[in-house]
Amino acid sequence: MKAVIVFCLMALSIVDAAWKPLPENLKEDLIVYQVYPRSFKDSNGDGIGDIEGIKEKLDHFLEMGVDMFWLSPIYPSPMVDFGYDISNYTDVHPIFGTISDLDNLVSAAHEKGLKIILDFVPNHTSDQHEWFQLSLKNIEPYNNYYIWHPGKIVNGKRVPPTNWVGVFGGSAWSWREERQAYYLHQFAPEQPDLNYYNPVVLDDMQNVLRFWLRRGFDGFRVDALPYICEDMRFLDEPLSGETNDPNKTEYTLKIYTHDIPETYNVVRKFRDVLDEFPQPKHMLIEAYTNLSMTMKYYDYGADFPFNFAFIKNVSRDSNSSDFKKLVDNWMTYMPPSGIPNWVPGNHDQLRLVSRFGEEKARMITTMSLLLPGVAVNYYGDEIGMSDTYISWEDTQDPQGCGAGKENYQTMSRDPARTPFQWDDSVSAGFSSSSNTWLRVNENYKTVNLAAEKKDKNSFFNMFKKFASLKKSPYFKEANLNTRMLNDNVFAFSRETEDNGSLYAILNFSNEEQIVDLKAFNNVPKKLNMFYNNFNSDIKSISNNEQVKVSALGFFILISQDAKFGNF
């Protein structure tokens, strides 16, 4: 049976595939933008981005066609993990502003027709949160808000109850003298895991959602959900065989600490809160897990779980069939009512351009915008920002710091979190201060929004062009078909019965290719050139059987009867 499954999955990468007619849910052609507040715009000159800075730049979202943006954590926090260690879920960290500033941002966004959602971090709190401090003292009802265990005695010595290893490495258990017990933390020791088997914890976290929804927020991006429940039998996890170092996260197979079935019931309870409100509220799920476990989130109330295939399944060395498989797998295994989505990057990864190079990064951006469903953009990727070198001395990310001077560059996420490059002025227009929390990329003189607005071939103007096309009601009706035109060229079409068709041709190889577009059914002989990454002077093609595609080249063709696209 395994062999059959593997064969079927492999076959998806080479056969023609089509999805038609396109269900209503696939017409949710939205663009979602991730704001990393520390690095977006500094309004007060302290070198750290803030809420007022985001408000100042809302028109940027409008210009690039964004429908909804989400804020990475802005809550009070000791900043051990840059806001993902929350000490108060219902307030704002002073470095970002005040809760009044946040209310004003919500109002300003809504006035411009933008939706705004918050990062919600339900798996753990900060160890400085009042709940944990009371739990340390064994005060009811907080004594059972976290997962405590007395450990076990081995050779006369007390040791952690299991061999579980945290995401950042080291034991997932830490001892506290106050409780004479170990507490669980799947991330940093300063991030104790909440106990969702305690219904009072779930009630309190549901109330956090209500607090922000009542203030006008349109929903949440929910962080790290696969870790939210554990197997309470506290069994040792089997060893992976990948390493002999018990302090490395890959030392064990996470069968008791990840993807526990009860997780999905918690998600449903979160959705129940969102459904209490008359206006539609959104829930976007972060879950790094396998495809089948990811797809289950659709059935438990998620608008969609993030599709991390561009992050997990392909690299700079991937070939065209890998990209076809990526698309086909998601579209095939997504439930009929699901909304597809495409996530090229986020704050935990190297930047898109640094992972793939500029031309392949442009191709991936093109795919994210022109495939059906939701395109998710990480701040700065719309202008092709790349990773910034950060020295060991200037490293801020705890994941990098914990790796030590010799290994920090392989672990630190700082290079992808540097200030947005607005223009070529001081600190790239991010701040009036030359001393920013992370250094600005030295390429900001040429890679910046102001410069790219003036260059018709820039990354930003490409993004705008495709975003505008995505918004066309006729384009939203278009069915999806995927093809391999040869071993090196992946193509997909968006076809309608009466309103025209689009053909995206992408050569991921380093050699020029000649392809026959008649691999698509009823493709017109003559097609207009909507976009060409290497030759913007070509306006059309008149022979669809012998089409040249430059090395690392791609172009978008539109039928002459199309009611979308501007010519």
From Swiss-Prot:
Glycans are attached at residues 88, 123, 247, 290, 313, 319, 499, 507. It is an enzyme of class 3 (hydrolase). The record marks 348 as: Transition state stabilizer. GO terms for molecular function: alpha-1,4-glucosidase activity. Pfam families: Alpha-amylase. Monomer. This is Alpha-glucosidase.
